[in-house]
Amino acid sequence: MHIWRIARFTLVAALASFVVACGEDAAEPAAPVVVNKSPNDEREYAAVTLDNGLQVLMVSDATTEKSAAALSVGVGAFSDPMDFQGMAHYLEHMLFMGSESFPEPDGYMNFAAENGGSSNAYTSSEITNYMITIENAAFPEALHRLSEFFSAPILDPGYIQKEKNAVNAEWSMRRESEGRSIYRLQRALLGEHPANRFTIGNLDTLADKDTRELHPATIEFFEQYYSANLMALVLISPLPVAEMESLAQQHFSLIPNKEVDEPVVTTEVNFEEVAGKLIRFKPQRDLREMRLSYIIDNNAAEWRSKPGDYLGYVIGSEMPGTPADKLKSMGLISELMTSSYESLYGNYGTFEISVQLTPQGMKRREEIFDVLSGYIELLRREGVDDRYAEEYRQSLDNRFTFLEKIDDFSYAASLAAAMQDYPIEHVIDAPYRFDGFNQEAVDSLLAQLVPERLNVWYISQEEETNSELEFYVGPHAIEDLEARDIEAALALVNRLGLAQPSQNGLLPEAFDLKETPAEVTSIAVAENVTFWLKGSENFDGLPKGFTRLQLSTDKALNSVENFVYLSLWESLYDLKQARLATEASIAGMSLSMSASNGISLTMSGFTDKQPELLARALEGLRVNPSELEFGQAVERYLRRIENSKRAFPYTRFTPLLGMLTREGRYTDASLALAASKANLEEFTQFVETVLTTSHLRAFFFGNYDEADVRAAYTQLEDFVTPSRSAGYARAGIYNPEPGATLMLNREVPVEDLGMLYGFAAPEASIKNQALARILARHLRVRAFETLRTEEQLGYAAGGGSLDLYQHP
C-alpha cells in the first residue's frame, strides 16, 4: 500500500508549526498531490494523510444530492487464521453491531434509511470495504457513526451467534453456485498457499476451538490488522474540501495507528504440484465449458502497460482469422473470452481463456485445446504485434477523457479500493492508463503461458468424477494433463490460417457536440412512422448518445411459438454479431438486440461512428442460420430454461412476477415444448413477417440532431418495411383491484427457498410511485433487521418497489 503524506494546515497543525518555528526555521510543507482526473470531471479532489497515517481522499461536488463515504482496510480473507476461516468476513458483520456512542445493533442501518441513504460492506481476498450514502445534512453524523466502527466498536459477544448464523446463511445461499465452487477448487489446488482459504466462513469454521474461542480470536484479529496506517478513506459531498478535511480529522483521527505492516502474500507454489492438471468438474446447471487457466506471476505493478489486458485484447479478438472467429465458423464454440487477474492469489494471478462449447465442440475438445495452445505458441514465436498499441491507447484514452459519473455510493467504494492498489495520483486514471506497448512485459507473460503452469478445466454434466469439494457442491476429478505435441498444434493453427487480428475500424475520430432539443421532439420520418429525439442529461456535454429502434408486433404477444422464435432470433443475432459487438465495445460503443413484444436494436456510446455501426448491425438482421446453427440455438434455449430453475430463488422473482401480471409471458414448460417443435422454415418466415409488417419507432437520446434521426431512417429503409397501419403493440397488464389476490408457487431443485410478498396500489399515479419508493426504503431496512438479523429466517431479506405501468 502506498502512503502519501500531504501537509495540511488545520488550526492545531498550524499552532504546532508556530511553536516549532519559534526556535528554528519551519520546514517547507510538502507540495499537494494532484489527482489525475478526467477532463470531463468538474469535481474538486484533494488528499491528506492524517497524523495517525490514515490516507483520505476528498471529493467536493457541488451538484451531488447526497453524500457518500467509504473506508477500505488493507486486510481480507487471505489473512484469516486457519483455525477460524471466514474471520475477516465475520468481523465485517460484527462491526455493524454497534459502537460506544451508538450501541444499538440496528442503529447504523436505521440511521441511513431514515436519512435517505443506505450502507453496505464487502470482504475480498486482500481488502475489506465499508461504505455509506446519506442525505447531505446527515453527513457529519454518518461519519461519526462510521468512524466508530474502527475506533470504538463494541464487538458485543451477545451477537456472536446471530452473526455466525448470518455468515452461515450467506454461505449456504451460495454453496451450490458453480462460480463459487470452481473458484474454491482453483484455490484448493494451491495446497499450503494462503489463497487456499474458505473465505466466507460458516458455523463449523467459526466454531470455538479447543485451543481458543472465536470472540477473543476476533478481538485479536481486529487489534492485529485494523490499524489506521492500513486504511484508506474517501469522502464525497458538496462541502468544500477544507470542511471535509476537518470532518475527517474530527472523526477518523481517533482510529489508532498500530504501525502494522501491510499483509503481503509471499508463499511460493510448486508448479509440479499445483499445475499440469486436467480438472473435470460436474456443475449443477447444464453447462459446457472448457478453460485454459495459467498461473502467472503477479504483474499488477505493470498497470501502466497492462500486459495481461493487452494480450487478452489480441487472443480474445473476434476479428477474422482469430481463434474465436475460426472456432465459431466451425460450429465448435458459441463464445470465447479471455481474462487476466493479476493478483488473484496475492503473489500470483491467472490468465484464462474460456470457451463455451457446442455439442459438436464437446466431441472435439482436444482439437480446440490444440487451436488455443497453438495460437499462443504462434504469438510467442512471432511476437505480439505492437500495431494494436495505438488503438488500445486511444480506446482507453477516449473512455477516460469522456468518463461518465456513476453514483457516489459506488464511486466512493471503488476509489477506496483503488487507494489500496495505486498511488493516490492515479486512483482514477490507473484503469485507463496505457503508456505504450511494453514488449518485455508482454513477452514475459507469454513465457508463462506454458503447460507447466497450465490447468485445463472440462466443465459439463457429462464429466465422470470421483471427489467432492469441501464447503461447496462441486463433484470433480483431477488427473495429470497429457502432454500434447506443440509442433502439431502450431501446424494446425497454420493450416486453419489463424493470424493476429486486424485493426478496429470503429474508433471515434470526431467529438463535436451538436445542438440537441431540451424537450422530447417527435419527428415524422414517414407515414405512421415517428421517431423521437431529446438531449440527455446522462450525456450532457458528451459526444455520446443512446439509440433504440423498436419493431413491435402483436404476433409476439399472442403465441408462445412466436415468443420462442423471437428469443431464438435474439440468440442467433448476438452470436453472429459478436465480432461487431466486440469491435464496437473497444471503440466505446455498445450494440445489442433484445426480444419482448417484437425486437429492439440498441446502440449507445460515442456517436461519431454510430452510423457505420448501425449499417453493419442492420445487415445482420436477417440472421439466415444454417440447420446446424438453428439447432444449436434451440439447444442453448432449452438449456437456459432448465438452468434458470437452479438460479438463486430470489433472482427468479422478477420473471415469475412478469408471467403472473403481463400478457405474452409463458411458463417454462410451454416455452420448452414450443422450442422443441421449432423449425428453421417457420423461423425464417417469422423473421420476414416481423421485418415487413411491424410497427416501427425509435428513440434518440444524447448527441444527435434531426439530420441524424432522418439519416437513420434512410438506413433502415433498406432492411425494414414497417407497417403503415399497425399501432404499437403493448402487452396487456394486470389491473390491481382492492381485495384481489394473485398467488404463484414453484418448486425449485435447490436447497434455498424464496418468498416475494407484494402489494399493488389500485390507483396508477406518479405520486403513488414516489410514495411506494419511500415506503420501500424503510421496509427494506425493517425486513433486513427483523427477518435476517433478529429472527434469522434468511440472508437475502429486503424490500423494494416496481411499477406495473405506473401502478406501484
Model-predicted regions and their roles:
Residues 30, 98-99, 142, 149-150, ...:
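Scaffold signal of the M16-like zinc-metallopeptidase fold and its non-catalytic homologs
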Residues 18-21:
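C-terminal motif of bacterial Sec signal peptides marking the signal peptidase cleavage site
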Residues 262-322, 409-430, 460-462, 472, ...:
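His/Glu-based metal-binding/catalytic segments typifying zinc-dependent metallopeptidases
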Residues 23-25:
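Bacterial signal peptide processing site
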